[in-house]
Design a protein with these regions (language model features):
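Active-site acidic-Proline motif in GNAT/NAT acetyltransferases
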Residues: 90-96, 124-126
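Conserved acetyl-CoA-binding loop of GNAT-fold acetyltransferases
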Residues: 134-144
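Active-site beta-strand termini and strand-to-loop segments that position acidic
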Residues: 66-68, 154-158
């Protein structure tokens, strides 16, 4: 992993295109916590590169961070329902602020789309760091579940 002190200058945040789908899915498949296979993505969630490319033309958008041309992490959201669908960071870049950056980009977009409240589903297992990460950023559990995942919500900050 690059040193976190020198990585900030090398990080490039940009909006995803359909051409980025294979590299971002490779990042999602590389994660150790909440691991998943391509077959599980397709069979359990109906997620394919073709389907995502189609949805990116209408209601799905995503942002990624690159470091030296390599996809380090990404996040995607759904404007039709205010959901942050995924946040994933390659293990080589964990702890470098990548997840926070891509999540902020998606949240900003969803709020700009008119959602006063956005949501995501996270594994409630306390051994998985995701829920703590989200709570540290202001997300709150609401007690609802989506399958085996717990729903967390973020309310749009009031203008100052």
């Amino acid at each position: 992993m690059p040193s976190s002190s020198g990585i900030d200058a090398a990080i490039r945040l940009r909006e995803m295109t359909a051409a980025d789908l294979d590299p971002v899915l490779a990042v999602r498949l590389s994660t150790h916590e909440n691991a998943i296979t391509r077959q599980e993505l397709e069979e359990d969630y109906g997620i394919t590169t073709e389907g995502l490319a189609r949805d990116m033309k209408t209601h799905i958008r995503g942002w990624l961070c690159e470091v030296d041309g390599r996809v380090a992490g990404f996040s995607m959201g759904d404007a039709s329902n205010g959901e942050v669908q995924v946040v994933a960071v390659h293990p080589d870049f964990e702890g470098c602020g990548i997840g926070r950056r891509v999540l902020a980009a998606v949240c900003d977009w969803l709020f700009a789309e008119g959602h006063a409240r956005i949501w995501l589903a996270a594994n409630p297992d306390l051994d998985i760091r995701a829920t703590g990460f989200y709570e540290k950023l202001g997300w709150r559990r609401n007690g609802a579940m989506k399958g085996e995942d717990e729903i967390l919500v973020l309310v749009k900050p009031s203008p100052r």
